[in-house]
């Protein structure tokens, strides 16, 4: 099928507008950006139903074609069903295929065999996450290899991810493009009152409550002493989850568990007015929550690993266990000048590396290379003029 210029299909997310994680937010930003620059953009959207009545339908949202795919399956099987139906439908439509994540990469060879151009964001190293049982980790491991070899072009959102992918494909096949963010220069303090909080009198963690995000380490470290400040742990807790119960049991009376908050204005206010942001992620690349903390000017206390060191730069105090985390928290709560320096460094780092426009332009250059009449081989594809990402 001959591909016209400036036509893109985005798959791998639940759809737009964004109601879930970082990939959905990126898909919305990128689709709107391209639509405003004359591209024909379609985004696949998952529609969960009890009974399939209309397998595929489309509408137009803010200049973007949304392709709704119905699935009656639940959980992981529903996601796979959706991924397969997206691939099958994409065979009937022109355009470069931008795939966000590799969880359903087993179906990508169908696109390549049909001569389609595939550009895949490889996300984090999902198969390393301890929360997954062995069969699921094996599935992700195999899919990572399939995506790496099926896609003409790979994107890593962090240099360490690009290094990892170089064990699967030639390094020339991968371009580094991180996640983006927007400056937060003000936010109302009103949302804090409902949680019993005062500006600059608390620190905040915003993450899924999972072992590889070190939530238990953070809660134990904060609760090791009387702080005179509060720790806000934002995330969904489940009553039947043993790890969640352990986190709650470790908390002092200065720890607040508001649950999951999906109102972006409230989350933005919680970040902006926090004395520091605690980030325990250990697996993945450029984490959206950490980028957003930098844009909010947060002093950062982060787990010491290559992902967080590169992303936060000089804006972070680093920890690797309960003791070092407790020491970093105590330092951030006691030293006003240090917090000011870290806050300034956070904004400088965000402006230098994580502007949305830089990110979106870099993605567009890659898609243009793939959409060109003869296509771009990995070694020929355009590199972003941003050496700080390499």
Task: List each language-model region with its residue ranges.
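An aromatic- and histidine-rich active-site surface loop
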Residues: 78-123, 127, 285
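Short hydrophobic beta-strand element within catalytic cores of glycosyltransferases
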Residues: 276, 295, 299-302
């Amino acid at each position: 099928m001959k591909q016209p210029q400036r036509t893109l299909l985005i798959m791998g997310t639940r759809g737009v507008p964004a109601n879930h994680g970082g990939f959905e937010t990126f898909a919305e930003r990128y689709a709107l950006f391209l639509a405003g620059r004359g591209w024909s953009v379609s985004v696949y959207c998952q529609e969960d139903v009890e009974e399939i009545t209309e397998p595929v339908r489309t509408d137009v949202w803010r200049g973007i074609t949304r392709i709704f795919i119905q699935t009656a399956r639940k959980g992981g099987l529903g996601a796979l069903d959706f991924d397969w139906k997206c691939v099958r439908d994409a065979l009937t439509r022109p355009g470069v295929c931008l795939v966000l994540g590799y969880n359903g990469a087993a179906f990508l060879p169908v696109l390549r065999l049909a001569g389609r151009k595939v550009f895949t964001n490889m996300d984090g190293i999902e198969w390393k996450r301890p929360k997954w049982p062995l069969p699921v980790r094996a599935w992700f491991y195999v899919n990572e290899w399939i995506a790496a070899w099926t896609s003409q072009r790979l994107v890593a959102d962090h240099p360490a991810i690009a290094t990892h992918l170089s064990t699967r494909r030639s390094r020339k096949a991968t371009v580094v493009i991180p996640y983006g963010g927007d400056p937060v220069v003000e936010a109302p303090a009103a949302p804090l009152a409902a949680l019993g909080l005062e500006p600059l009198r608390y620190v905040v963690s915003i993450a899924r409550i999972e072992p590889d995000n070190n939530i238990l380490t953070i809660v134990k470290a904060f609760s090791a002493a009387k702080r005179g400040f509060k720790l806000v742990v934002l995330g969904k807790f489940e009553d039947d989850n043993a790890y969640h119960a352990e986190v709650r049991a470790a908390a002092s009376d200065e720890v607040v568990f508001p649950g999951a908050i999906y109102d972006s204005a409230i989350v933005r206010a919680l970040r902006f007015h926090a004395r520091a942001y605690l980030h325990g992620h250990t697996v993945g690349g450029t984490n959206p929550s950490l980028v957003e903390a930098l844009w909010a000017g947060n002093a950062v206390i982060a787990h010491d690993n290559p992902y967080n060191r590169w992303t936060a730069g000089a804006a972070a105090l680093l920890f690797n266990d309960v003791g070092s985390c407790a020491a970093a928290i105590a330092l951030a709560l006691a030293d006003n000048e240090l917090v000011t320096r870290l806050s300034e460094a956070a904004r400088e780092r965000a402006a230098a590396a994580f502007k949305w426009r830089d990110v979106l332009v870099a993605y567009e250059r890659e898609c243009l290379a793939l959409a060109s009449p003869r296509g771009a081989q990995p070694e020929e594809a355009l590199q972003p003029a941003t050496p700080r990402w390499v």
